[in-house]
Amino acid sequence: MGKYVSTYFSPNRGAADTLIGFISKCSVSIDAAVYSLTHDGIRDALIDAHRRGVAVRVLMDRLQSKSSYSDDEALEEAGITVLRDKKAGSMHNKFIIGDSKAVGSGSFNWSKNADKRNAENFLIVRLAYVVREFQVEFDNLWELNS
């Protein structure tokens, strides 16, 4: 694992486990903008973080959230604030900001298929200026969809 940037891949090469570990290490805040969320382990890690007192906000693609496999309702039932983008089909981001210290991003959809079948990538970046840029983008998206 690099000091400032770490790379992970799928299928079955650590991307999902790394994302779950990233979430489990957060102690203050998690902001996530995702296209799809159907991976049970990622869902459970977000719920566990919320139960530990971590402030969790999730912005999802509206059309994907309507899938019967989507975990958005499970997050809401656990008390996590979930917004769906107002322009259905336009949210294709896949990033997470942890404790305002690191960003996880890449092509990796938060799904079982991405973990087990698809060729995907996931980066963790620990550079303050990159984290700030992602936070500004998340805050803008959150405000636009509130």
Locate each region found by the language model.
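A general structural motif
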Residues: 9-15, 39
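Short, structured motif recognition centered on aromatic/hydrophobic residues
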Residues: 35, 95, 134
